Amino acid sequence: NTGHDVGGFAGPAPEPELFVRWVQNGVFHPRFTIHSWNTHLDGTPDGTCNEPWMFPDVLPMVRAAIQLRYTLMPYLYQLLRRAATEHEPLLRPLWLDHEHDPKAWEAAAAEEDAGSFLLGEALLVASVVERGQRMRLAYLPDNGERGWWSWHDGGEWHRGGQTVRLDAPLDRCPLLARGGSLVVLAEPAQSAATAHSRVRTLHAFPFPPSHGSATVALTWVED
């Protein structure tokens, strides 16, 4: 049950830009919630409350991030299942699946890689945590010839074992998928309670052509 009280549970309300970035980070956590309980010194409510619609100018960006979370629900469910049965963490430091890559260990302490983490084995999240940041450097762990595909920008492929420059406009968080991965997505929904559609879309992120032929297996469980 890992996750933030997005916007902060106490103290002053966040500014619009960093609120968007906080939401974009939070949607990848098992526990995602936007709320707060701010009080005066005497314990009475101070009238502030963090809500998705608190800043109308950035509401479309907040909505897009939340919709991405709902499309990822099948993937998140599989990760939670593996956490319960195989004791594998959902949120992983870059070195956890790349223990033989010394740069992955170094990246964990590098300021430029603050906010980078793996979501399961397939996805790499490169969160933006600075005001005004529209590009960020991110280290992509060395995974042989598999490399990493950008979730955005038409699926640009990057070789692992290097630091790359990723575009980070305010309307999205840099997200990459490991080459050779299969990710099952759902249709967008308003909430988990209304997500009745059983339609699933399989997104395949292939090995690069230089890898030659390959076979990828996927075990999927929906209770």
Describe each PLM feature range:
Residues 170-223:
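Accessory, solvent-exposed terminal regions and/or long lumenal/extracellular loops of proteins
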Residues 1-172, 178:
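Catalytic-domain carbohydrate-binding cleft regions of carbohydrate-active enzymes
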